[in-house]
UniProtKB/Swiss-Prot annotation:
Interacts with swi5 and rhp51. Required for normal mating-type switching. Keywords: Cell cycle. GO terms for cellular component: mating-type region heterochromatin; nucleolus; nucleus; Swi5-Swi2 complex. One of its GO terms (biological process) is DNA recombination. This is Mating-type switching protein swi2. The keyword Cell cycle applies. Residues 302-316 have a biased composition (Acidic residues). The lineage of its organism: Eukaryota, Fungi, Dikarya, Ascomycota, Taphrinomycotina. Residues 1-35, 301-342 are annotated as: Disordered. One of its GO terms (molecular function) is sequence-specific double-stranded DNA binding. Residues 9-22, 319-332 have a biased composition (Polar residues). The keyword Membrane does not apply. It comes from Schizosaccharomyces pombe (strain 972 / ATCC 24843) (Fission yeast).
Length: 722
């Protein structure tokens, strides 16, 4: 610590005491007053009266006054902090006003910081910083009262204990100049600064925090868009009203909808997803390549249905040690298909088939009673059953099939492995109105004679055929003939799971060699129409022959015929005469071929020859016409070519004129540039370009314009005028 002289204490808070003799000696010597605060000291420089008149050292030495200072060094930031410094003196006997002394503040540790104490007001003395020329602290100085300098920690407590009037403290100046008072101005204790709210500093600070409120006119408030400036507002279109599209009313509510993601079955091992197995479980097999035989003579086909492979079933035989073919190899994969074990073969009997059909009939009857009211049901009964056939005829058919099932061999039964019994009664509900439209495809006849049964299922089919006449029996039930014969008119039954008897001649459904024959799902109407006349002749004498009708009733026959014929018109039956000149005349639409009755006569031959000659003349005239049209087109094209050539000449002249105007400017610039280019860059061509004057050809070459386009002759360096 640098100390100039012996450190002596300076009296503080003693306004009546004067400066000690040692201090006065130092003032007189001009060496300043030492301090016990370390290297901080003040050196008196000049002495003034309050009116600005300087005083000499003798007069200054006789002055009695006290001064106080508080300089501290911030150890944390190593910054020089000056809380306050002020000096008061006794009043001058001449002017009766307190005089003051101007000091310079020095700091050995921080030489860049310096200041001086001065006053231009008799009530205040303050410390100025030379760097900013802005007073830091302003404290009252009234009645020669010396106030101990206040630190930032003790300022609030000392201000609260002492009673100062508003005039004594310059609150506006204090808040604007001292950061200590600024921090105190925002404390909870508002009674300390009663006049702070009216100060200018308070207004400045309040403007930053003030909420600007817009007063609207009375009435309906304006609806502003979420966009500050509407894009369509400048175009004169009306502003958008309400919420923009895509904006929710309550955006803070995040609605999370649970999504059902499909379960991904991960492979248990890596090889489950990569290796192709060689052996497969016996129960899983693919469809073999069996021949698909079609019997064209009988109009029937053999179909083989096999169960598809079950994809949901795992492969327990597939392990990490399994060996398989490389997926990237081009060789075909070979699968070993083991035969189907005996315990897994489907078992199906006639009794189970009949039981299933009985259940389906009961479910159908029950659903029909619950589905339609009585009046509607009766109305549909009259429409669909005009002959009054008993609705329970299906049970009769089942009873007949029970008697015949024992005589049918199992070898003629064909099964589908996909067949499953009906799930519920709802799967068999069919509206009776829909059955009316499909009765053409379901014609069941129950005539006496040889009986053949057929069952058709939605999932599978079992065709029951009789191969020889020994296994066929005649039905002798007394009431069965009525229901079976009248079932031709009752075409409303559309149950595919029900066995229904069909009686036709053996030649219709089976061939003479007694080979197994598999019929289609539904009999074609043409087959039934051909068999109806023979059926009427071999019918029982007690049967009413008028009841046997075609697949659709006579009532609808004419309407159907009209509907089919209405959109078509009969073609013209005569042949166009122009076609007679051809050696092989073509038929026009459905016209009849030329016969002897319609052969052309001698009179017609003259007309034909004349027509032929006229056609030749017309052909020659057409050729001449085509030549004339070609000549006209050529003339037109020549005129168009002339127009295009004229436009090209006009453009060429304008381009030549533009080159002549721009060439002098280019040549001057180009020549100037060539003078600056060194010979090493252009080598041999540099001298030639310097010596040879720039021409229009060089200008066109720089622009990459061909000479022939503007008809420029490089030899004569001129335009070729045509």
């Amino acid at each position: 610590m640098n100390v100039n002289k012996k450190q002596e204490s300076i009296p503080v808070n003693t306004g009546s005491e004067s400066i000690s003799s040692n201090d006065n000696e130092r003032f007189e010597q001009g060496k300043g007053v030492g301090s016990n605060l370390g290297s901080h000291f003040f050196e008196p420089v000049e002495y003034y009266y309050s009116d600005g008149k300087p005083m000499n050292q003798t007069e200054a030495s006789q002055m009695k006054g006290t001064f106080s200072r508080d300089f501290s060094l911030n150890e944390m930031n190593n910054e020089f902090i000056t809380d306050s410094f002020f000096c008061t003196t006794t009043p001058d006997p001449k002017t009766e006003s307190p005089s003051f002394v101007k000091y310079n503040a020095h700091c050995d540790d921080h030489p860049e910081i310096s200041g001086h104490v001065s006053s231009n007001d008799k009530d205040f003395a303050y410390f100025e910083d030379k760097s900013e020329n802005q007073p830091l602290v302003t404290l009252p100085n009234e009645n020669n009262q010396v106030i101990e300098p206040l630190s930032s920690q003790s300022c609030k407590s000392q201000l609260s204990t002492q009673n100062y009037s508003e005039s004594d403290f310059g609150w506006n100046q204090l808040c604007d100049l001292d950061p200590i008072f600024k921090s105190l101005a925002f404390t909870d204790d508002t009674n300390l600064f009663p006049a702070f709210a009216d100060s200018e500093a308070a207004l400045i600070m309040l403007k930053k925090r003030e909420m600007t409120r817009v007063k609207h006119r009375a009435g309906r408030p304006r609806k502003y868009s979420y966009v500050n400036k509407d894009l369509n507002f400048e175009e004169g279109l009306p502003r958008r009203r309400g919420r923009p599209t895509g904006w929710r009313k309550y955006p803070e509510k995040e609605e999370i909808y649970p999504t059902l993601s499909p379960r991904i079955k991960k492979p248990r091992k890596v090889f489950d997803a990569v290796v192709i197995p060689v052996t497969i479980k016996p129960s899983i097999y693919t469809e073999p390549s069996l021949p698909h035989h079609i019997d064209w003579n009988n109009g029937c086909s053999e179909e083989f249905d096999f169960e598809p492979s079950r994809e949901d079933e795992d492969f327990p035989d597939l392990t990490s040690d399994s060996t398989g073919q490389d997926p990237l190899s081009s060789e075909p994969t070979i699968f070993d298909i083991s035969p189907l074990p005996s315990d897994m073969e489907p078992t199906f009997s006639e009794n189970s088939l009949i039981t299933i059909n009985k259940m389906a009939i009961e479910e159908r009857k029950q659903s029909r009673r619950l589905e339609q009211p009585l009046a509607e049901s009766q109305h549909q009964e009259d429409l669909l059953n005009p002959y009054g056939v008993d609705q329970d005829f299906d049970e009769t058919c089942i009873n007949e099939s029970e008697q015949q099932a024992t005589h049918i061999p199992n070898s003629s039964i064909k099964f589908n492995y996909d067949y499953t019994p009906p799930k519920s009664a709802t799967s068999h509900k069919h509206k009776r109105v829909d059955l009316l439209a499909s009765r053409k495809e379901n014609v069941w006849t129950g005539l006496y004679g040889k009986v053949q049964t057929e069952m058709v299922s939605n999932r599978g089919e079992a065709v029951l055929n009789e191969n020889n006449s020994k296994n066929r029996t005649n039905v002798t039930k007394p009431n069965s003939y009525k229901n079976s014969v009248l079932s031709i008119g009752n075409n409303h039954s559309n149950h595919s799971n029900i066995i229904k008897p069909n009686t036709y001649k053996n030649t219709i459904l089976s061939n003479e060699n007694n080979t197994p024959n598999y019929s289609n799902v539904c009999l074609s109407t043409s087959l039934i129409n051909r068999s109806l006349p023979s059926l009427k002749s071999t019918m029982h004498p007690g049967v009413n022959k008028d009841l046997i009708t075609r697949p659709f009733k006579n009532v609808n026959k004419m309407s159907v015929r009209k509907a089919l014929i209405k959109p078509f018109h009969p073609p013209i039956s005569k042949i166009s005469r122009t076609r007679l000149t051809v050696s092989s005349p073509e038929r026009l639409y459905c016209a009849k071929p030329i016969s002897m009755a319609t052969a052309p006569s001698e009179t017609d031959s003259k007309l034909i020859n004349r027509i032929r000659n006229l056609e030749l003349e017309i052909g020659g005239l057409k050729e001449q016409l085509s030549v004339v049209e070609l000549a006209l087109d050529t003339d037109k094209n020549s005129k168009q070519i002339q127009v295009v050539e004229r436009k090209i000449q006009n453009w060429r002249k304008s381009a030549q004129l533009a080159v002549e105007v721009l060439f002098p400017v280019f040549s001057l610039k180009f020549t100037t540039m060539l003078q600056e280019v060194p010979q090493s860059v252009l080598r041999t061509s540099a001298n030639d370009l310097r010596t040879k004057p720039c021409s229009i050809g060089t200008y066109l070459e720089q622009l990459q314009i061909p000479f022939h386009l503007l008809q420029y002759n490089s030899e004569t360096e001129s335009w070729d005028l045509e």
